[in-house]
């Protein structure tokens, strides 16, 4: 399997988990002029922007470590554009990372708090 196929596999696993926990999947691999986010979901009037990361081993770090300041700034711009264009201004906003080390999931909720960055 190439890296794209592996990425899709773990995004699929993440979607399965989200659906089991009653999240509604709004978008997958959403792109706009600011970048791309793996999953956008909704639950209880909250929009969740989710980055999925996979590492076979932690030799080069954990997946969530790839969600650095630069990536976060792109996600924030992308999210703001999405919220405005889709009319979700009355929703709370959350940013998560679903990070896999092998098949072990570390779901980090609120990697950035929306109200801390002006949402």
From Swiss-Prot:
GO terms for molecular function: nucleic acid binding. It comes from the Bacteria. CDD domains: PoNe_Nuclease (cd20736). PANTHER family: UPF0102 PROTEIN YRAN. Belongs to the UPF0102 family. This is UPF0102 protein FN1370. It comes from Fusobacterium nucleatum subsp. nucleatum (strain ATCC 25586 / DSM 15643 / BCRC 10681 / CIP 101130 / JCM 8532 / KCTC 2640 / LMG 13131 / VPI 4355).
